[in-house]
């Protein structure tokens, strides 16, 4: 007879996806748990590489980083060996918040000499940085599309290959769609319904590009393209070309004179959020929940 162990989760608590500890069920915790699942299921980090609420030391301060990641071969989980730091906040905390925004993340990264990557998210906004040194010896934080996966392949961050597209898992597709929809609403000034329709156009382009076998994927935006207006316009031109094919195939949904109305900066951001996923192969129940 199989001995099945039953875990009873106390009311108001959740069981942490990585370390199994009970934590308070809060809006901030929901964001962290979603990110933890993505780290393991999509980025393929092992739970042994990840530490939750890791205490940092700089000066007299001892703040706790929400999530830190070490190399898979790291045997000493010390502050000097941290490679990635992730800060998760509830939706109401803005990235520009002086105490809990991206500046907090950058201060944590600065205190960890070998930490190259950092991510800040509140479930609606996401900011990713790679730490470096400029020609004057100053610490700089460069915007990136995403943190690297466990294999460390940076090329996949900028232009994923067809065979490397990832299936979305659990609430992550909903999480991504929500982030994109909010970005349109805030940055393009569109109300929820028009914002959804613009996002729908981009999703149709993503699926159309996935179907275009065996040609290389054209639905992508590199970190460099996202960072300047010329690159953003290049992305818009590339995606608009895909949308021309979408309109021909789905004439009952889109008019012949329809176009993607998003600001190039917003479009580049949304493309960079969606480009890593395989929407065609993602489980239908997950897609249904997200849509």
Positions of PLM-derived features:
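Long recognition/docking surfaces used for binding and targeting
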Residues: 204, 208-291
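A short, conserved, highly charged catalytic patch centered on acidic carboxylates
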Residues: 1-117, 125-162
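Short, hydrophobic/amphipathic alpha-helical patches that form generic packing surfaces
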Residues: 36-37, 198-210
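Short amphipathic alpha-helical segments and their helix-coil junctions
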Residues: 8-20, 170-190, 270-275
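DNA-processing P-loop NTPase/helicase core
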Residues: 168-172, 194, 202, 210
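Charged alpha-helical initiation segments
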Residues: 156-172, 176
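Structural motif
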Residues: 26-30, 185-200, 280-285
């Amino acid at each position: 007879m199989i001995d099945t162990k039953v875990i009873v989760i106390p009311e108001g608590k959740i069981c942490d996806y990585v370390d199994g500890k009970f934590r308070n069920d809060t809006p901030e915790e929901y964001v962290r748990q979603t990110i933890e699942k993505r780290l393991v299921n999509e980025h393929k980090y092992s739970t042994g590489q990840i530490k939750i609420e890791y205490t940092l030391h700089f000066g007299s301060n001892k703040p706790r980083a929400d999530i830190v990641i070490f190399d898979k071969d790291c045997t000493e989980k010390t502050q000097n060996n941290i490679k990635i730091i992730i800060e998760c906040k509830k939706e109401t905390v803005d990235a520009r918040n002086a105490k809990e925004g991206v500046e907090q993340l950058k201060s944590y990264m600065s205190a960890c000499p070998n930490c190259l990557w950092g991510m800040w998210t509140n479930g609606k906004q996401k900011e990713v940085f790679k730490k470096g040194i400029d020609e004057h010896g100053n610490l700089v934080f460069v915007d990136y599309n995403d943190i690297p996966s466990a294999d460390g392949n940076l090329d996949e961050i900028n232009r994923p290959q067809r065979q490397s597209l990832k299936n979305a898992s659990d609430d992550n597709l909903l999480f991504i769609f929500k982030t994109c929809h909010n970005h349109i609403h805030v940055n393009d000034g569109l109300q929820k319904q028009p914002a959804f329709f613009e996002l729908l156009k981009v999703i149709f382009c993503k699926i159309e590009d996935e179907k275009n076998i065996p040609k290389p994927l054209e639905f992508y935006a590199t970190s460099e393209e996202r960072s300047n207006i010329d690159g953003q316009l290049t992305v818009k031109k590339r995606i608009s070309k895909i949308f021309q094919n979408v309109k021909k195939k789905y004439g009952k949904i889109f008019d012949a004179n329809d176009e993607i109305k998003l600001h190039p900066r917003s479009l580049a951001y949304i493309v960079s959020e969606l480009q890593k996923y395989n929407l065609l192969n993602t489980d239908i129940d997950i897609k249904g929940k997200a849509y």
